[in-house]
Amino acid sequence: MSKFFTKGRIALLIIFSVLIIDQIIKIWIKTHMYWHESIRITDWFYIYFTENSGMAFGMEIFAKLFLTLFRIAAVTAIGWFLHRFVKLGLKTGFIICVSLVFTGALGNIIDSVFYGILFNESTHSQIASFMPEGGGYAPWLYGKVVDMFYFPIIDTNWPEWMPFVGGEHFIFFSPIFNFADAAISCGIIALLLFYGKDFNDAYHAAIKKS
């Protein structure tokens, strides 16, 4: 059993498993929900469909293209390091963490690269279709990342007597994210908590052996 589950195979298993789960969730959300439609699971957990163009401060075409190309370059670099780490025989837990980060980044790149041509626009009145006759909502590299997990664990108003924020609405945790984002976060947090000292050594070993 141990010979079958080599570090390389474990990495591949994580990559394919996370990627498949991530894309199944995103495609289902995209083809079954209206934009900004919400499904209540509990008071603190909602499925809330939104899309993230990845553009900051409203910057359009060139910013989006640059961001997608940057993501592709980043995931290529992470993939190269992951390959080197496996070849170097580093700790299995370390390989798992890097695999999670790599796969999460790759999952969001798929959205950015392909979703614009594979789906039409999601709106408040239209659910997107896969491979629509009229074409997709954007060209290659200009797709939007699908997000859906929303955890408003604390949803309340600040007490009126508090300075500056009194009476204002407060939500924790407000970001809406996807399965790929969760994989990235879990991988990075685990790396920092358990492999902070190993990462620097692994990086230099990978560079030296290349």
Where are these regions (language model features)?
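Alpha-helical transmembrane bundles and membrane-interface segments of multipass inner-membrane proteins
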Residues: 1-210
